[in-house]
Amino acid sequence: MYALIEYKGKQYKAEKGAKLVVDKLSAESGSKIDIDTVLLISDGDKVTVGTPYVSGAKVSATVGDSFRERKIIVYKHKAKKNYHRTQGHRQAHTCITVDNIVG
C-alpha cells in the first residue's frame, strides 16, 4: 500500500516505514504529524484518486532529525560591466518516517 501526498508544495510517494526528506518543519524531533493532503492511494488493485484530494485519507508520520544540505554557490556576472556577485545557499530539510496510511 502506498499513497501520493502533497506537502509544502511538493509531492512524495509515502509507504509504511519509508523515510522521506521534506523541507524544514517547525515541529520537534520525535513528534507526530498528520498529513491530510493525500492525492492518491493504491492498495494492490484498488486505486483511489482524489479530486484534488482523497476525502478522509491521511498519512501519519514521525518527525526525525533536521539537517542542512551542502552549500551551493550562486554566481551572477555581467560581461564588460565589472559586475559580479557570489552568494551561497544551504537548504534546510527534515527527515520524516511514515507510520501509517489511513484511507
UniProtKB/Swiss-Prot annotation:
The keyword RNA-binding applies. Pfam families: Ribosomal_L21p. One of its GO terms (molecular function) is structural constituent of ribosome. GO terms for biological process: translation. PROSITE patterns: RIBOSOMAL_L21 (PS01169). GO terms for cellular component: cytoplasm; ribonucleoprotein complex; ribosome. It comes from the Bacteria. Keywords: Ribonucleoprotein, Ribosomal protein, RNA-binding, rRNA-binding. Part of the 50S ribosomal subunit. Contacts protein L20. This protein binds to 23S rRNA in the presence of protein L20. HAMAP family: Ribosomal_bL21 (MF_01363). Belongs to the bacterial ribosomal protein bL21 family. NCBIfam families: L21. This is Large ribosomal subunit protein bL21.
